[in-house]
């Protein structure tokens, strides 16, 4: 079943950890593409210097961060790679969780085509399908068109995985510093990256 609106409410760090093991789903041209979330990063504006909303900075791009939890925040890095975030916290508190890596599940052939323009790929290429925020967006067809979309929609949502199928029993959740935020002064060291230790699709060990 889809995660209800209440799933995204509450402390952002706790929501980040709850997202691990759940399934991110995007329906593209009627075909389901999905992956199990194995790595996330929490961003807690306005006090977090790594957050786009640090200091309460409000722009056209970040406006969705100030809205209701349970919406998609998508942005570009380096002008070419999309990043997908889940908005958390109450209205007016601009916080969210970046989805950093997935284990692909549904629509594998479409995911391969999106990433490599072919379906016959090597084992190394398979491991690189969705092991990074830009890679997973390309694989699932997530673009700026999805910015601000409610995660209660039929085409973009988080699907809760049943307890008996959840991979949390197989992997330990580890916390550590977030990646590529050297500009963020003391926030560089916050242990707000959560991931399944040893999972092959985690972006950085």
Curated annotation (Swiss-Prot):
GO molecular function annotations of the record: alkylbase DNA N-glycosylase activity; DNA binding
Alphabetical list of Pfam families matching this protein: Pur_DNA_glyco
Gene Ontology biological-process entries: base-excision repair
UniProt-listed InterPro entries: Formyl_transferase-like_C_sf, MPG, MPG_sf
Keywords annotated in UniProt: DNA damage, DNA repair, Hydrolase
This enzyme's EC code(s): 3.2.2.-
Disulfide pairings: none
Keyword Hydrolase attributed: yes
Keyword DNA damage: yes
Sequence intervals crossing the membrane: none
Gene3D superfamilies: Methylpurine-DNA glycosylase (MPG)
Top enzyme category: hydrolase
Family under the similarity heading: Belongs to the DNA glycosylase MPG family.
Protein name: Putative 3-methyladenine DNA glycosylase
Annotated source species: Bacillus thuringiensis subsp. konkukian (strain 97-27)
């Amino acid at each position: 079943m889809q995660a209800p609106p209440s799933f995204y409410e509450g402390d952002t760090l706790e929501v980040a950890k709850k997202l691990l093991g759940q399934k991110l789903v995007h329906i593209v041209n009627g075909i389901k593409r999905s992956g199990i979330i194995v790595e996330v990063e929490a961003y807690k504006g306005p006090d977090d210097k790594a957050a786009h909303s640090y200091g309460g900075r409000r722009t056209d791009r970040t406006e969705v961060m100030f809205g209701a939890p349970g919406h998609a925040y998508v942005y570009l890095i380096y002008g070419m790679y999309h990043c997908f975030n889940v908005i958390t916290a109450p209205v007016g508190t601009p916080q969210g969780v970046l989805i950093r890596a997935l284990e692909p599940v549904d629509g594998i052939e479409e995911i391969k085509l999106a990433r490599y323009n072919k379906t016959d790929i090597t084992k190394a290429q398979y491991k690189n399908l969705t092991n990074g925020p830009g890679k997973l967006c390309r694989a699932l067809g997530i673009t700026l068109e999805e910015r601000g979309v409610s995660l209660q929609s039929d085409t973009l949502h988080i699907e809760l995985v049943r307890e008996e199928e959840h991979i949390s029993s197989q992997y330990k959740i580890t916390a550590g510093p977030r990646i590529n935020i050297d500009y963020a002064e003391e926030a560089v060291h916050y242990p707000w990256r959560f991931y399944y230790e040893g999972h092959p699709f985690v972006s950085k060990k």
